[in-house]
Structures are given as C-alpha cells and as structure tokens.
C-alpha cells in the first residue's frame, strides 16, 4: 500500500523525503500521461503499469493492499508469506524503490506544469 511504499522509498533513498517523489515529472504522484521526463519519471510510469497489472488479480487493490516485507541496510525483501496480490504489489513497490535509488533526481522536474509537459 502507499504507506508501505513510502517506507520502502525511505529504505532505498534515505537522503530524500518521500514527498520529493510524490509530485515529480508526469508519472510520480496521481495520474500519469505523456512521455516520462527522465529516468526517475520512467520508474514511476513502470510502477503505475505494475499496479495496473496487479489490479487485474481478483479482489486486489494495490493502493490499499498490505504486504509483508523487510528493509535491511537499504536492501528490500518481500516475504514469502504474501498471497498473490500482496506479492505482486510488494514487488511493484520494491522494484520502484530500487529504481528511484538508481535514478538521478532533477529538481527542475518537481511540480512541473503537467498540461504543458505531459501531453
């Protein structure tokens, strides 16, 4: 769920507030359209698509689904006791948090004009 995703981001990118990722580019945060502005925004586009796929599992609501995971020294592990929905959502969040850690953060792409740049 989004609370756990926030904590995963804190695990892999401890130097930044998770809020820095909540309104970034065309895909980080609510919605998503157009061409991603950079690699970090592409991480969010992939995460959005991953949630859409997880949502196809019967009764699976990715934004609200809790799962079991652990963070150890910046390494995320989804636990084996997750059901198929929880395992899918956990993996979406884990992969996105890892992607965030490897992508440069461009302050110019925070809080951009979505109508102008995300067609």
From Swiss-Prot:
Similarity section: Belongs to the phospholipase A2 family. Group I subfamily. D49 sub-subfamily.
Binding locations of Ca(2+): 27, 29, 31, 48
Gene3D superfamilies: Phospholipase A2 domain (1.20.90.10)
Coiled coil: none
Cofactor-binding details, from the entry: Binds 1 Ca(2+) ion.
InterPro entries, A to Z: PLipase_A2, PLipase_A2_Asp_AS, PLipase_A2_dom, PLipase_A2_dom_sf, PLipase_A2_His_AS
Disulphide connectivity of cysteines: 11-71, 26-118, 28-44, 43-99, 50-92, 60-85, 78-90
Protein name (Swiss-Prot/TrEMBL): Acidic phospholipase A2 E
Cofactor(s) for this UniProt protein: Ca(2+)
């Amino acid at each position: 769920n989004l609370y756990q995703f926030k904590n995963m981001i804190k695990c892999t990118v401890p130097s930044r507030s998770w809020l820095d990722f909540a309104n970034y580019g065309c895909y980080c945060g609510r919605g998503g359209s157009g061409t991603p502005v950079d690699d970090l925004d592409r991480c969010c586009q992939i995460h959005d698509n991953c949630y859409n796929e997880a949502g196809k599992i019967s009764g699976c609501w990715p934004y609200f689904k809790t799962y079991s995971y652990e963070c150890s020294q910046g390494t995320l592990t989804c636990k084996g006791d997750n059901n198929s929905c929880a395992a899918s959502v956990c993996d979406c969040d884990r992969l996105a948090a890892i992607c965030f850690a490897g992508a440069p953060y461009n302050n110019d792409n925070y809080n951009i004009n979505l109508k102008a740049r995300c067609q």
